[in-house]
């Protein structure tokens, strides 16, 4: 099985988009990319906007090769909407290229969903239904694609139990010799998700960590995330790719240090330098103004 991480916070944008090739089936997972419109009270720096365009081009390139597209939930960093969005680098043309003629395995648009995502799901389906090859609501279901199985979890909370951000579905890809789980915005904060991952016993887990950058609003999430991921590591011995929300926090290397097995970011998996641009937005704006700043990565 071939796994290609496409876009994420360690690559400079908000995303967990991944391309997987298994048994001749090409699968694009969560094909969205976005920037946080405000961080430290600041809009995205110029280099963030440039990186967003670069990641968009990469996602479109892999979309052209994909047979199957999966969507874990309807936030714009996990699917590409059909409107022109500056901070999503989205357009109808991009969306059509991703979804037209594809098998879409997607989070249920009406069950276990909050109001905001229900509206987004309705808009998505209105545009995707006429152009997709087939659309299946994937929650809790398994699909056999000629020797490759895609098994989806039941809907689990986006973060901790009772999260107002709604629900997501995880996906297990099994080609008979290797098992990979993509667990997008579980944030390692709810038991249902942790237990499902342990039960499925993957060889590789791709997941997003807790949103510790939110400070008081995410109180206790650091400790819970460490505890839950260490449990997954002990029970499965899976290789871990950890990225997304946790990498919006400058302290993410310390989080990685507390784990019993050190994960890789998307950048680390690709053997390139981590560039957590959003976490360093304040410094990037100063740099744009010609001020001298220290950054833990190269720019330009």
UniProtKB/Swiss-Prot annotation:
Superkingdom classification of source: Archaea
InterPro entries: Metallo-B-lactamas, RibonucZ/Hydroxyglut_hydro, UPF0173_UPF0282_UlaG_hydrolase, UPF0282_hydrls
A Pfam family it matches: Lactamase_B_2
Gene3D superfamilies: Ribonuclease Z/Hydroxyacylglutathione hydrolase-like (3.60.15.10)
Coiled-coil residue windows: none
UniProt similarity note: Belongs to the UPF0282 family.
Listed name of the protein: UPF0282 protein TGAM_0379
UniProt organism field: Thermococcus gammatolerans (strain DSM 15229 / JCM 11827 / EJ3)
């Amino acid at each position: 099985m071939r796994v290609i991480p496409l876009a994420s916070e360690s690559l400079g944008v908000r995303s967990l988009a991944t391309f997987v090739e298994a048994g001749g089936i090409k699968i694009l997972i969560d094909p969205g990319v976005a920037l946080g419109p405000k961080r430290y009270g600041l809009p995205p720096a110029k280099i963030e906007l440039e990186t967003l365009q670069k990641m968009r081009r990469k996602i479109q390139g892999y979309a052209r090769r994909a047979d199957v597209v999966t969507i874990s939930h309807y936030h714009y960093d996990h699917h590409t909407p059909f409107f022109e969005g500056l901070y999503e680098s989205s357009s109808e043309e991009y969306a059509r290229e991703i979804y037209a003629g594809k098998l879409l395995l997607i989070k249920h648009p009406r069950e276990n969903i909050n109001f905001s995502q229900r509206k987004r799901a309705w808009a998505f389906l209105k545009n995707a239904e006429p152009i997709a090859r087939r659309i299946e609501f994937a929650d809790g279901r398994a699909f056999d694609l000629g020797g490759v199985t895609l098994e989806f979890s039941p809907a689990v909370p986006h973060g901790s139990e009772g999260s107002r951000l709604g629900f997501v579905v995880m996906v297990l890809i099994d080609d008979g010799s290797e098992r990979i789980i993509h667990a997008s915005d579980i944030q390692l904060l709810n038991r249902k998700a942790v237990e499902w991952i342990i039960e499925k016993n993957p060889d590789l887990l791709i997941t997003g960590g807790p949103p510790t950058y939110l400070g008081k609003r995410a109180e206790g999430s650091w400790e819970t995330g460490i505890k839950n991921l260490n449990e997954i590591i002990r029970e499965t011995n899976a290789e871990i790719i950890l990225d997304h929300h946790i990498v919006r926090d400058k302290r993410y290397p310390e989080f990685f240090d507390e784990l019993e097995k050190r994960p890789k970011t998307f950048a680390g998996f690709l053997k390139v330098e981590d560039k957590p641009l959003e976490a360093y937005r304040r410094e990037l704006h100063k740099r744009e103004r010609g001020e001298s700043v220290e950054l833990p990565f190269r720019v330009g």
